[in-house]
């Protein structure tokens, strides 16, 4: 799509109103060329629980309704494929607000500096202390339960994780 940057906000507004009906929200909107056609990809997540497993029927229904709504959208005059999909179970946590929403979730976090001899931690994000502006994560290291406090500014990378 040649004009994707100029129409992305309008597509987002249309998609947001439709996705709310299915208790979904936009995680990310992408445009890329694949299988010899333009693809408009809308990655979604649950509104209330960002890492909740999504209902396949909701994704299909929202895709169909969004496809109908975009059919008459003047900015999409060239052929394209619409793909509404889950953002994934191990999706990146991209902001402090998203990390706050991840409290009580199992996450993987990489810190700029080591804490308790490790800069990479996988565990349950227990809490966000508003007064201290710090997060607390609990994890196991060599069979012992540990807790670490960190600030968002110390985070190099974070994502949801699957506990095995």
From Swiss-Prot:
Localization, UniProt: Cytoplasm
UniProt organism field: Mesoplasma florum (strain ATCC 33453 / NBRC 100688 / NCTC 11704 / L1)
GO biological process per UniProt: ribosomal small subunit assembly; translation
GO CC entries: cytosol
Pfam families assigned: RimP_N (PF02576)
InterPro entries cross-referenced by the UniProt entry: Ribosome_maturation_RimP (IPR003728), RimP_C (IPR028998), RimP_C_sf (IPR036847), RimP_N (IPR028989), RimP_N_sf (IPR035956)
TM stretches of this protein: none
Record's keyword terms, sorted: Cytoplasm, Ribosome biogenesis
Keyword Ribonucleoprotein applies: no
Protein family (similarity comment): Belongs to the RimP family.
Main location group: cytoplasm
Designated name of the protein: Ribosome maturation factor RimP
Protein role: Required for maturation of 30S ribosomal subunits.
């Amino acid at each position: 799509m040649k004009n994707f940057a100029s129409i992305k906000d309008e597509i987002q507004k249309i998609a947001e109103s439709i996705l709310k009906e299915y208790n979904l929200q936009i995680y990310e909107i992408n445009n890329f060329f694949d299988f010899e056609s333009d693809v408009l990809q809308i990655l979604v997540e649950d509104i209330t629980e960002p890492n909740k497993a999504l209902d396949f029927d909701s994704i299909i229904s929202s895709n169909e309704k969004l496809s109908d709504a975009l059919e008459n959208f003047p900015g999409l005059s060239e052929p394209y494929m619409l793909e509404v999909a889950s953002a994934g179970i191990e999706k990146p946590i991209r902001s402090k607000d998203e990390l706050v929403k991840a409290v009580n979730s199992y996450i993987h976090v990489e810190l700029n500096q080591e804490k308790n001899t490790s800069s990479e931690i996988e565990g349950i994000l227990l809490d966000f202390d508003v007064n201290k502006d710090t997060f607390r994560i609990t994890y196991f290291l060599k069979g012992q339960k540990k807790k670490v406090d960190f600030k968002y500014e110390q985070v190099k990378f974070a994502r949801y994780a699957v506990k095995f």
